[in-house]
């Protein structure tokens, strides 16, 4: 009897484990050889919204201002080394905000 009760719980436990596994997997965006986490793009938006660098710093650098922020996520730092950093960040933002470009679900098959 105890064995039947335990086997009846297995499907429920399996579903819970799958949900936990799915929620711990990171979603990545790949573009022009760069691989960044979706979560990093959300942090980038937050950094840009709350940080205004000095006009002197902006004038001295060809890089996007956020490249000078000390809290820039590590996976975004290589983008700053690129000569096309501004356009790459712009494209990554577009991809991150477009559900049809980004599978937000592990089982995603794309938009119709």
Swiss-Prot record:
Homology family: Belongs to the guanylin family.
Superkingdom as given in the UniProt entry: Eukaryota
Propeptide part(s) removed at maturation, as residue ranges: 27-88
Tissue-specific expression: Stomach and intestine.
Coiled coil: none
Protein name as annotated: Guanylate cyclase activator 2B
GO molecular function list: guanylate cyclase activator activity
Keywords: Disulfide bond, Secreted, Signal
Source organism (scientific name): Homo sapiens
Function field: Endogenous activator of intestinal guanylate cyclase. It stimulates this enzyme through the same receptor binding region as the heat-stable enterotoxins. May be a potent physiological regulator of intestinal fluid and electrolyte transport. May be an autocrine/paracrine regulator of intestinal salt and water transport.
InterPro entries: Guanylin, Guanylin_sf
Compartments, record wording: Secreted
GO process terms (BP): adipose tissue development; body fluid secretion; cGMP-mediated signaling; glucose homeostasis; multicellular organism growth; negative regulation of blood pressure; reduction of food intake in response to dietary excess; renal sodium ion absorption
GO-annotated cellular components: extracellular exosome; extracellular region
């Amino acid at each position: 009897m105890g064995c039947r009760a335990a086997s009846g719980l297995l499907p429920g436990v399996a579903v819970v484990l799958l949900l936990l596994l799915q929620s711990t997997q990171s979603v990545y965006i790949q573009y022009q050889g760069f691989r960044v986490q979706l979560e990093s793009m959300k942090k980038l938006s937050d950094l840009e919204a709350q940080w205004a660098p000095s006009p002197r710093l902006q004038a001295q650098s060809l890089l996007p201002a956020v490249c000078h922020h000390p809290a820039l996520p590590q996976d975004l730092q290589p983008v700053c080394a690129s000569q096309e950093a501004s356009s790459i960040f712009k494209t990554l933002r577009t991809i991150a905000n477009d559900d049809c470009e980004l599978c937000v679900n592990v089982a995603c098959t794309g938009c119709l």
